[in-house]
Amino acid sequence: MSDLSKRDQIIAAADQLFYRNGFEHTSFAHIAEAVNISRGNFYYHFKTKDEILAAVINLRLADKRAMLEQWEIEDKNPAERIRSFIKILILNRAKIIRFGCPLGTLTTELTKLDHSAQEDANRLFTLFRSWLTQQFQALGYNNRADELAMHLLARSQGVATLANAFTDEKFIRQEVKHLYEWLDQYAEGVA
């Protein structure tokens, strides 16, 4: 028996299916099959696909917040915390190569669909942007903190997109190395 409620199982399955297949190409039937429930039981928990999408976005936000909070506890200084952010590319490289970045692919798809939840999905990037800005401020780059945060977000998204396009793990490793070197310049105050 799973520790997750049926509703939580549905959200977790939808999260994975939206990531792998895309929001538009994932149906109620796909999610119900993944959780092994009837469509009728499914509708008890969610009436619309948009309700599931909102729950998936909230799940991703909660997961990312918990991850950032963990880094705040584990990593002693802002440079180490930023390094943990960069390391996501290495830790998730197999999934990135196969499916792209879960945040980037969802926000891009919702933008293409002109979906009303696009702004909600953008909160995922805003969470990282705000957190990275705080880390660069803690490194002493108050006037440039947001610029540096956006630069790092753009680089990480570019790496994920190109690694997915070229299915190239070596590229990810190479770019992560460059990002670490870039970060070290700012951490040492030589940038």
Regions from the language model: what does each represent?
Residues 58-65:
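Short, basic, alpha-helical segments at the C-terminal edge of helix-turn-helix-like DNA-binding modules
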Residues 9, 13-51, 55:
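Helix-turn-helix
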Residues 71, 89-94, 103-112, 138:
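Helix-loop "lid/cap" segments that line or gate small-molecule binding pockets
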Residues 104-108, 143-162, 178, 182:
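Hydrophobic alpha-helical segments that form the core
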Residues 55, 69-99, 149-152:
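Hydrophobic alpha-helical connector segments
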Residues 5-6, 13, 148:
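N-terminal positioning helix adjacent to the helix-turn-helix/winged-helix DNA-binding module
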Residues 92, 112, 134, 153-171, ...:
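Amphipathic C-terminal alpha-helical segment
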Residues 65, 80-83, 95, 112-140, ...:
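Amphipathic alpha-helical packing segments from all-alpha helical-bundle domains
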